[in-house]
């Protein structure tokens, strides 16, 4: 049994979800300031929307709630829009709904799909009529006790016409995006459930295995797929299917390139555990990770002796270098910025994504002078000189994440510059800055897109030794895996 997610339980919460009790909101820092900010905005918006529709005292609430019932897409869609009007992830989920012809009837949608469809309607209204009409729609809906009348009096069109107009708007938009887009190659023959979410695709060092995690109503499973035998096997299972808020932050996984073992990080009763799994023998051992509150990403060193963690401790997300032999970690960054997706690169340098506004990695007490940015760039940090990080992408209006080393000169990562998350490649170059008693060089990076899919590339994992990549997409209502090898990994798509 569990009381997590029950509205009356105001003493617990899951990251990424906002609990509302009366006029109180309960939020939890998920390791990303943008997500945290969205939680706060959504909580405030839900309180304000509730007061606008039902009144701000209990008598009005009881009276109005008995006289009118607002559909989920109307209320939840509006609070989601107020918290985050639009982003590439919402766009991708809506693109999938419209592609499956599920958008025309909101009453048949369930779960998050209802909220996404509702949010798209409010987004369309704001883009077409202006966001100033939204409070008027709420007021007229409350006064007339009818959402149909609210839209008709303010917009001058019926709700049915509004729905058709919104659908045509997005259909035209997505048809334009698909023109000239890169087609998918054959997907891996891995069965996935429509009712489950999938994450953490990781290719083993020898290129034979692909591991991934499934999450169905908080019941998580870890699978290992054998490319050679075309078979998969479940190795870990945790949790139970419960109708509650779904925590999708675990498990976190990566392969040890030397031993060939899979390391899986899970959370149980407030403690972090790292389990070693041999694909042939099964579970080997389990140890507790100390002095960390939450681990979000991990990456093994080439010698298999160290692990990079992006982890939360004392309310901030930083990069840690973990020693397997000593079961202890060294903190590499210490500031208010979100430092995510660490990866080993050439020599003693690492890659990571961050929303930092300053290249100094130890600004523990400077909370106001250098405010975090709303998007992340890819950074390089030399472990021998770990005071300054070098910005590799420098795109303040676009978001990048999940860097991975391609070789000693190049790196690949995910970016949303086109409005759809695709894979990019970058390399560091140099030019002569001045010639005096010695030549001074200026270092910079060059970045260009590798893929042009019309759907978000949600996650990927690259095997540097075998030049093999596994990609994860949401297509036709279910998650699908696609693997590539050799030159296909870095061949630039030209329409």
Question: Language-model features: where?
Answer:
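Short coil/turn segments that connect the beta-strands within blades of beta-propeller domains
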Residues: 206-208, 258-260, 303-305, 347-348, ...
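A flexible loop/linker signature enriched in serine peptidases of the S9 family
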Residues: 92, 96, 194-195, 213-223, ...
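Blade-edge beta-strand/turn elements of extracellular beta-propeller
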Residues: 182-189, 327-332, 386-395, 443-448
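Pro/Ala/Gly-rich low-complexity, hydrophilic intrinsically disordered segments
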Residues: 159-204, 230-234, 354, 427-449, ...
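Active-site-proximal alpha-helical
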Residues: 70-90, 96-156
């Amino acid at each position: 049994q569990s009381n997590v997610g029950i509205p009356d339980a105001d003493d617990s919460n899951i990251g990424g979800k906002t609990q509302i009790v009366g006029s109180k909101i309960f939020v939890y820092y998920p390791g990303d300031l943008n997500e945290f900010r969205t939680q706060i905005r959504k909580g405030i918006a839900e309180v304000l929307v509730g007061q606008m529709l039902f009144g701000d005292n209990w008598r009005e609430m009881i009276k109005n709630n008995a006289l009118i019932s607002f559909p989920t897409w109307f209320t939840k869609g509006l609070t989601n829009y107020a918290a985050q009007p639009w982003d590439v992830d919402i766009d991708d989920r809506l693109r999938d709904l419209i592609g499956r012809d599920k958008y025309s009837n909101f009453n048949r949608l369930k779960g998050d799909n209802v909220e996404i469809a509702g949010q798209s309607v409010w987004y369309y209204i704001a883009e077409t009529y202006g966001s100033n009409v939204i409070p008027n729609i709420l007021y007229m809906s409350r006064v007339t006790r009818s959402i149909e009348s609210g839209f008709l009096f303010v917009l001058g069109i019926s709700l049915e016409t509004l729905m058709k107009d919104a659908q045509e708007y997005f259909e035209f938009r997505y048809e334009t995006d698909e023109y000239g887009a890169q087609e998918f190659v054959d997907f891996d023959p891995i069965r996935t459930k429509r009712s489950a979410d999938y994450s953490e695709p990781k290719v083993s060092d020898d290129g034979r295995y692909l591991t991934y995690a499934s999450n169905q109503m908080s019941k998580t499973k870890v699978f290992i797929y054998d490319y050679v035998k075309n078979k998969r096997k479940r190795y870990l299972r945790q949790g139970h299917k419960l109708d509650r808020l779904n925590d999708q932050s675990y498990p976190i996984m990566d392969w040890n390139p030397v031993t060939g073992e899979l390391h899986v990080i899970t959370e149980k009763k407030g403690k972090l555990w790292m389990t070693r799994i041999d694909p042939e023998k099964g579970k080997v051992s389990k140890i507790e990770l100390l002095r960390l509150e939450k681990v979000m990403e991990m990456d093994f060193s080439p010698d298999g002796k160290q692990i990079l963690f992006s982890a939360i401790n004392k309310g901030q997300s930083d990069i840690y270098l973990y020693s397997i032999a000593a079961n202890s970690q060294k903190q590499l960054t210490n500031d208010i910025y979100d430092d995510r997706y660490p990866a080993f690169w050439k020599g003693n340098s690492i890659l990571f994504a961050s929303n930092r506004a300053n290249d100094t990695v130890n600004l523990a007490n400077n909370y106001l002078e250098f405010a975090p940015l709303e998007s992340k760039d890819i950074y390089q940090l030399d472990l021998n000189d770990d005071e300054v990080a070098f910005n590799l992408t420098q795109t303040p209006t676009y978001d990048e994440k999940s860097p991975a080393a391609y070789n000693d000169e190049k790196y690949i990562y995910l970016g949303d510059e086109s409005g759809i998350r695709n894979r990019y490649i970058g390399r560091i170059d140099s030019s002569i800055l001045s010639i005096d008693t010695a030549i001074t060089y200026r270092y910079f990076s060059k970045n260009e897109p590798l893929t042009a899919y019309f759907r978000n590339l949600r996650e990927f994992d690259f095997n540097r030794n075998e030049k093999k990549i596994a990609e994860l997409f949401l297509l036709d209502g279910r998650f699908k895996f696609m693997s590539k090898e050799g030159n296909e990994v870095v061949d630039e798509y030209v329409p």
